Structure formats: C-alpha cells, structure tokens
Amino acid sequence: MSCYLITGGAGFFGTVLKQHLLKQGAECVSIDLEPDSFQHPRFTAYQGDINDDSLMEKIFSVHKPEAVFHCAALLAHVKKDLKRLWHANVDGTRNVYDFALKYGVKKIVFISSNCLWAKNFDSPVTEDEEPNPVEIYGKSKLEGEKILLSQPDKINSIIFRSPTIMDEGRLGLLGILFEFIDEGRKLPMVGDGTNRYQFIYAKDLAKACDLALAADYSEIFNIGADDVKSFNEVYQYVINKSGSGSR
C-alpha cells in the first residue's frame, strides 16, 4: 500500500486531495498547523509546523512516505508579518525537501501559484514568459519552486502553477454573487464584464496530483482551462441555469 504525506492536509485543498487519494486505496499522512478532525482507518494527522524538525523526523521515520504532496503555505493576505510568511513558504519548503532527500522520497508534487507575473501585460502571458512576481506570496512560491528543482537527479518534482482553487464550501466572492442571482438581484460588475479570471475545480487539481505520481521526471505545469470565460459569460450561464431574473 502506497503512503503519501500531505503538508497542509487540514486545509481546503489538502482535504479534497486526501479524500481523493484515500479513495484510490492509498494511506495518507497529514501535517498542518490546524487540527484535523477528519477520520479514516488509513489516515493519520499530525498538528504542527513543517519547520519543526523533531516532528518531521517522526513523520518521515514512522510512515516512510513514497511521495509528498506539498500544499502547505501561508496565503497572500498574511502581510502583517512578512517574515512569518517567508519562513513558512520558503524555509518550510526547504525543510520538507531536506527530509524528503534524507528519507529517499522519489517524488514531490508542489502546489505553486499562477501569480508569478507582474500586472498590466499588453498581451497574454505565455509559458515562455519569465516569472517576475511583485508580491511577497508569489516571490515565496517561486523560491519554493527553485528549491524543489535544485536536485532533479535525486527527487522528481512536479510543480503545478495553479489558479484560484474552488469547490463546494469555497466559492469566495462568487458565493455572494450566486446568492444575488438566486435572489434575482442586479449584479455588480467591474468594468464591462469582458474581463476573465481563471479558477480551477479542486477535484480536477486532485486528479492532476494523482496523475503526477506516474511522472519519472521534474517539470512545471501551468494548469487550468484552455477556454476561460468572461465574467459576463459566467454570470449569464448561472442566470440561465437557475432561471433567475438577475441581470
């Protein structure tokens, strides 16, 4: 039976991912700063910090994971203490990587971000565009990528540059807009509605993580949809499906 370690396993995507992997018959181990009430006979949760060497030593020595899904990160809105964000996202990634090296882990799957480029491009950004993040969160993710790709002959690292992750229970601002549609209210719009913003369905990202296990190489993937709808199109689709009188 395969055993996988999920950092940030009590978080939104970590929870979706562990449920997916458990359905595939795997054993899952989680480490997260927050407590994890999820229960399953093949799941073990540890509450703690990925920078805690003694805890990481225990997890790796006891469970000997075959692969690590590195989902743990402090998010961009944690700006009151930028050193804390950097310590979690960069030093934490380095610690995960070092323990994976020490215990012979052959695969790390890293949930990075698509916010690695500056704003206000005159044309669409391609995969060939050199990352140039302007915010501390994007900079920390890019630094994490560099760490994980530093020794590809020892560990295969698959990196997913993911857009905003959504699923039931995490709709963000769209949840409010969907309530407006349900109530038939007029929808607020930034600009003329032709702007596009990419999301990814959490279960689709979990499937991608599963597929990454088969890769015997290191690579960066910008993951998302080929056809990104405008906000006008998204709103109109939901309005039509719900039979709402919103506009």
Describe these PLM feature segments.
Residues 151-197, 202-206, 238:
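NAD(P)-dependent short-chain dehydrogenase/reductase
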Residues 212-247:
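Mid/C-terminal beta-alpha module of Rossmann-like enzyme folds, strongest
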